[in-house]
């Protein structure tokens, strides 16, 4: 008798406390790639799907890994217009490979960029550059990143712009940018003055301003000793 009463109580409780299922959100989530990268600006695929279903956003083109194909699929489910998806890629803004910069210490700890950064900024002379231990390689779900001569390099054709590497890099030198702008990126994030930069890296930006002066379109500016290019110009 006690078992029967308990069973009935659980049955009633399951009905009363049941959470309504958002079928549209589930359908949208099924159309998403499932990377849960957060590049869309929401907590993950489920968060983006819920926002679309509940009308919190009408932008169907926020999923960078899914691209135009996913945008069209979402538009079909929701009845919204398919959003424009600009092809994006992550870029490692550093040229401090083994030929351009020296090591200042013999690091023998865990091969982790995050761990190495905590020891005098890392083993390389330039404290702003890529350490090259591959934390970004480990988190990339698309095998788009490889270490080449001590620096991480990203294959733009394999990159899905999920931002996993951007969020992982302890140096903050990986930027996400439109694919067509990547070739015009200034590949250095050294904040030191020119004389110091020369000592640290042969390929580092020394802030000589030549690119600023010679660019007839005004597409290059200097912010905090870092040259910034504007490819759209």
Label the model's feature ranges:
Residues 1-214, 221:
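Ferredoxin-type iron-sulfur electron-transfer modules and their immediate structural context
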Residues 226-232:
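Residue-level detector of conserved catalytic or cofactor/ligand-binding positions
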């Amino acid at each position: 008798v006690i078992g029967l009463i308990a069973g009935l109580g659980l049955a009633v409780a399951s009905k009363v406390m049941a959470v309504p299922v958002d079928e549209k959100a589930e359908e949208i989530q099924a159309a998403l790639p499932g990377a849960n990268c957060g590049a869309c600006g929401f907590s993950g695929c489920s968060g983006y799907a819920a926002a679309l279903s509940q009308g919190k956003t009408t932008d169907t083109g926020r999923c960078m890994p899914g691209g135009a194909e996913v945008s069209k699929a979402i538009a079909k489910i929701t009845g919204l217009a398919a959003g424009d998806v600009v092809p994006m890629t992550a870029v490692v803004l550093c040229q401090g490979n083994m030929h351009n910069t020296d090591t200042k210490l013999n690091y023998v700890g865990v091969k982790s960029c995050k761990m190495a950064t905590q020891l005098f900024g890392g083993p390389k002379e330039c404290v702003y550059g890529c350490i090259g231990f591959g934390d970004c390689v480990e988190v990339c779900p698309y095998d788009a990143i490889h270490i080449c001569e001590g620096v991480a390099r990203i294959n733009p054709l394999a990159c899905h712009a999920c931002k996993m590497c951007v969020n992982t890099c302890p140096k903050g030198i990986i930027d996400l940018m439109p694919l067509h702008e990547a070739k015009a990126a200034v590949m250095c994030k050294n904040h030191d003055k020119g004389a110091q930069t020369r000592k640290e890296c042969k390929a580092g930006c020394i802030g000589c301003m030549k690119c600023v002066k010679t660019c007839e379109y005004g597409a290059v500016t200097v912010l905090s000793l870092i040259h910034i290019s504007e490819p759209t110009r």
